[in-house]
Each structure stands twice: as C-alpha cells, then as structure tokens.
UniProtKB/Swiss-Prot annotation:
This is Cytochrome f. GO terms for cellular component: chloroplast thylakoid membrane. Component of the cytochrome b6-f complex, which mediates electron transfer between photosystem II (PSII) and photosystem I (PSI), cyclic electron flow around PSI, and state transitions. It is found in: Plastid, Chloroplast thylakoid membrane. Residues 1-35 form the signal peptide. Gene3D superfamilies: 2.40.50.100, Cytochrome f large domain, Single helix bin. It comes from Atropa belladonna (Belladonna).
Amino acid sequence: MQTRNAFSWLKKQITRSISVSLMIYILTRTSISSAYPIFAQQGYENPREATGRIVCANCHLANKPVEIEVPQAVLPDTVFEAVVRIPYDMQLKQVLANGKKGGLNVGAVLILPEGFELAPSDRISPEMKEKIGNLSFQSYRPNKKNILVIGPVPGKKYSEITFPILSPDPATKKDVHFLKYPIYVGGNRGRGQIYPDGSKSNNTVYNATAAGIVSKIIRKEKGGYEITITDASEGRQVVDIIPPGPELLVSEGESIKFDQPLTSNPNVGGFGQGDAEIVLQDPLRVQGLLFFLASVILAQIFLVLKKKQFEKVQLAEMNF
C-alpha cells in the first residue's frame, strides 16, 4: 500500500514538473519571438499594406537601404536565386534587451508573385545550398507560400541572404500566366524601436512627458533611471522610467520642456524596402526566338555566299 502511494506521489511530481517546464518553454518562446521582426506574422494578415509600405517599418523607424537581385527572366518550374543584401557597418554594436551592447541581427521578408514559392531541398543545387548556409526560411502564412520570412540571423554572417525560389508552371497552375511580375522585399538590421503592443523598446530615444525641473534622478540597480520632473507652477511631479540602454542627457536641477529628449537615441539599425521585376518566360517563345535568330543568321550566310558566287561569275565574264 505504501509502495503504491509512493509511486502515485512520484507520478504526480513528475507530471507537475513536466507541466511547469512546458509552460516555461512556451512563455519563453513567446517572449523571444515577439521581440523579432517576424512578429508581424502575428499581427498582420499581409505584410504589405495597400499603400505599398511593408509593415516592418511600423517598428523599425530608421530608414536604411536594402538591395535585391533576381534574374531578368525565368522558365517555368525552375529554381533560381533571389539575393537580398542588407548592408551596414559591421563595426557597429546595438543595445540589447538587457542594456548591454552586442552585434546586430538581420531579417528579411520576400513577397513573391502568386505561384512562386520556396524551392524544395531536393531541387536545390549543391552550389546554391552552399550560398544559403544554415538559414531556415518559412512561409508568412500556411496559405501564403509566396511570402517568405527569415530572421533574426547574425548580420556579420548573413548580410547577404540567398532565397532559393521555384517558379510556377502555367501548364499545371491555371491562375499563373507568362507575364512580367513584381517582387517586393523588406530588410532590417538591428532591433526595433516599438513593440507590437505600441510600447517602446530600450533601443530608442525617451522624451520628457512633462515640462519642469529635473528634481531627482535615481539610477536603478539593474540599470536604467527614474527621473522625477517637478512642475513648480502646478506643484505636481511626474516620474519618467528609462530602461537600461539609452544614455542620459539631463541632470538634476535642469529645466526641461515637454517632449524634450531625456536620452540619446541608441539605435544604429533600420529598415528598408525595395522591389524588382521578373519575367516568367514561355519556352515556346524562347524556341521561336532562337529559330528566328538562326534563320536570320542562315539568311546572312546564304546572302554572302550568293554575293561571292555572283562576283565570280562577273569576274569570269570580264576575263572572257
């Protein structure tokens, strides 16, 4: 009986431990994912707004360049490279969530035409796999295979990202046609300045929420500050909380205005977007073009031969 009770108690403890561990894992994963660019998947059905703006710009406020390179034209059911470049100064360090400095991560979203999608691994050549490295791409939504996201990944290693893309075949996909299509890309380097809920991260500037005198500055044990602003005319006090990371620009006794920066702007990253065009080429059209070029070349050759033959006949008549 005691053995059965002991076994039952042990079983309950193991079950409880597993449940707690699973809960911690889920919470940790959620907090981590919400801090990175792909959180847009959770809040937006489509990453590109009707205005053409990519939603990543809502959280990454600084404007930075991004480049995309794709072939001018591709044939149906072929794998090609879409190369996205996210340039930045590799010597830069960003403010991390804990207030310390670290390297920049990068991320990208690639919006392909309907029908285009990530190439399956068995269709990717060894040379292309070497360019891709250890990157793991995912669809923006299960039903939106033409929109791909990647990141965050180390910027020093992946400031150039190669997407392996499979072109559609109009013979099997009736809604796809041989046309010129646009491709849109968004790329960021570094952390954002605003979280999905609208709150600020520690990677941005903090402004005064009231005008008055800085009456007290308390440096918090884990980093950051509590700044007390006293409005002498109204006799009220406002406390602004500064997280670890940004550098303080004001001192006690200083008179400040409403919305005046209390800190520096630590952000060294930013987001950019661009576009390109690609033609889904009809193989029959290519064959027709090659046939036409071959016929033109043959016609030129026959014309030259005919001209030489005519010159020989003329020369023979003159000698006669």
